[in-house]
């Protein structure tokens, strides 16, 4: 998939204001009385009060100051082959659509993650928390476990949930992210491919499917996406929101009608941050070492990063 971008000037710092619902309480209106100033001093005082009133109308409450390096570090997470393949498997964007990914970024900011804490495991923890907050379908988010924890995910997922709770505590339990906040985050680099992950209407809403015989969740990296009768095969490959250089998108596309049982090479999972939170012996799985020489850097084709890598004026 090609991702074209128009060159545009973007400031190195963006401030996103978040309105608080508590500020919208209804208060009785005071009667307005107009008094004509009787002297010059009174007129100057009147102008000063008017200026102060205009200042008070500016947005109040918490805000996010987004630096260029913050967005760059977040986008670099999607260089990870495993995360790319996870997005490819989520072909219907039910686990990681653009709004859930924007919430993940906001969690990173609220938690004040350093650049070194922009890691794979923290990405999956934040994404799981976003699904917990927003999604009615509980079982779908469990697909994150085998991708984040590897083949031993059944033993490791209790610790994963503890890390989720620690992240929730670190953001002061402010897990709600408004739609406007998400859209302002996406507007910083609107043509980046992760913001093209639009979920279809038929996958939205609080509609449960009680027929659990069709798909057993979670399925993990060793399986291919399930055919979706609602999205259709064409939609599944056109709107993945994934770089065309992903090895899975090119290798597995030809065998999508069968479930691949190829073994994946286990890798040690990097957890950068608090060493006390690191897993011991946990594994993640992928099948990319055989294609290592064939992979290309998708950022060379994705021009949406140009304003991040360019020199600041």
UniProtKB/Swiss-Prot annotation:
Keyword Transmembrane helix belongs to the record: no
UniProt effect for mutating residue 97 to N: Loss of CDK2 activation
Keywords from the named record: Cell cycle, Developmental protein, DNA damage, Nucleus, Phosphoprotein
GO terms of biological process kind: DNA damage response; establishment of protein localization to telomere; G1/S transition of mitotic cell cycle; male meiotic nuclear division; meiotic attachment of telomere to nuclear envelope; oogenesis; positive regulation of cell population proliferation; positive regulation of protein kinase activity
Keyword GTP-binding (UniProt): no
Pfam families, alphabetized: Spy1
GO cellular component labels: chromosome, telomeric region; nuclear envelope; nucleoplasm; nucleus; XY body
Region (Disordered): 278-313
Residues modified to Phosphothreonine: 224
Main location: nucleus
Domain notes: The C-terminus is required for CDK2-activation, but not CDK2-binding.
Subunit and partners: Interacts with CDK1. Interacts with CDK2. May interact with CDKN1B/KIP1. Identified in a complex with CDK2 and CDKN1B/KIP1, where it interacts primarily with CDK2.
Protein name listed in UniProt: Speedy protein A
């Amino acid at each position: 998939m090609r991702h074209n971008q128009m060159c545009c000037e973007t400031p190195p710092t963006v401030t996103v204001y978040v309105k608080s619902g508590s500020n919208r309480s209804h208060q009785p209106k005071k009667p307005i009385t107009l008094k004509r100033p009787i002297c010059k001093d009174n007129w100057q005082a009147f102008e000063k009060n008017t200026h102060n009133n205009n200042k008070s109308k500016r947005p109040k409450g918490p805000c996010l100051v987004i630096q260029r390096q913050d967005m760059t570090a977040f986008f670099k997470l999607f260089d990870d082959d495993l995360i790319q393949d996870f997005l490819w498997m989520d072909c219907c964007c039910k686990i990681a659509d653009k709004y859930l990914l924007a919430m993940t970024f906001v969690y990173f900011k609220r938690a004040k993650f350093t650049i070194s804490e922009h890691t794979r495991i923290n990405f999956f923890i934040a994404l799981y928390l976003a699904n917990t907050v927003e999604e009615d379908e509980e079982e779908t988010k469990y697909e994150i476990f085998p991708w984040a924890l590897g083949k031993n995910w059944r033993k490791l997922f209790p610790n994963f949930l503890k890390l989720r709770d620690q992240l929730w505590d670190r953001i002061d339990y402010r897990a709600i992210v408004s739609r406007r906040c998400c859209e302002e985050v996406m507007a910083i680099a609107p043509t980046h491919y992760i913001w093209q992950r639009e979920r279809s209407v038929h996958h939205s809403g609080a509609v449960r499917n009680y027929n659990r015989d069709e798909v057993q969740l979670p399925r993990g990296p060793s399986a291919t996406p399930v055919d979706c009768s609602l999205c259709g095969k064409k939609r599944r490959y056109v709107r993945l929101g994934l770089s065309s250089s992903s090895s899975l998108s090119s290798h597995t596309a030809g065998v999508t009608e069968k479930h691949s049982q190829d073994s994946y090479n286990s890798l040690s999972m990097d957890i950068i941050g608090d060493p006390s939170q690191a897993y011991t012996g946990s594994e993640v799985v992928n099948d990319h070492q055989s294609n290592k020489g064939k992979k290309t850097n998708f950022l060379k084709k994705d021009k949406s990063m140009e304003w991040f890598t360019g020199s600041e004026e």
